[in-house]
Regions:
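Sec-dependent N-terminal signal peptides
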Residues: 4-13
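C-terminal motif of bacterial Sec signal peptides marking the signal peptidase cleavage site
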Residues: 15-18
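N-terminal "mature-domain start" segment
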Residues: 20-54, 83-85, 96-97, 149-153
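Short, solvent-exposed coil/turn segments at beta-strand boundaries
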Residues: 31-36, 53-56, 66, 96-99, ...
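Surface-exposed amphipathic alpha-helical segments
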Residues: 32, 129-155
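A short acidic-to-branched-hydrophobic micro-motif
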Residues: 49-77, 127-132
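Signature of long, low-cysteine stretches enriched in small and polar/charged residues
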Residues: 84-121
């Protein structure tokens, strides 16, 4: 009887894990808020990309959330590979830790472009990216506020 119960629990656990993998990305995000405040540019089961409705904002944001394969998510060198990529494109690394990288991609003629990429496993294995266009240089605190805003979409 004990073996049967353990077997049953194992099957239920595997079923739960399999069901989680099949969930659409929107089941992890506050879609009501996203739909009311942003334009959805691209959406499928694995990813969603949305932008500010007001294109003339002084700080224009593009958010991208993507479910990742477990093997890619668990790669301990994923941030290092991103850093290598950005440095190869002559970008300036503003901040980097084991799950987040913030990069100044372009600064010219009072225009600034930033990328923030972060990985979150609180609900599922998600990659979050925020691309920012600004008419002023943003402080590290302002960039972290944008990262916090991106994280706030995860329910």
């Amino acid at each position: 009887m004990k073996k049967f119960l353990i077997f049953l629990l194992a099957v239920l656990a595997l079923t739960f894990v399999a069901c989680e993998k099949d969930k659409d990305i929107e089941s992890y995000l506050d879609m009501e808020r996203i739909n009311s405040e942003f334009n959805i540019e691209k959406q499928d089961k694995e990813q969603i990309k949305f932008t500010d409705k007001d294109e003339s904002r002084s700080v224009y944001r593009i958010f991208n959330f993507q479910k990742m394969k477990s093997v890619d998510f668990k790669n301990p060198k994923k941030i290092d590979k991103l850093e290598e990529f950005y440095l190869g494109k002559n970008c300036e690394i503003i901040y980097k830790d084991e799950s987040t990288i913030i990069v100044l991609v372009l600064a010219q003629d009072n225009s600034y472009a930033y990328n923030i990429q972060s990985f979150d496993d609180s609900k599922t294995e998600l990659m979050m990216a925020v691309s920012i266009g600004s008419d002023k240089e943003l402080s590290e605190d302002e960039l972290f506020n944008l990262l916090d805003e991106a994280k706030s979409f995860i329910k």
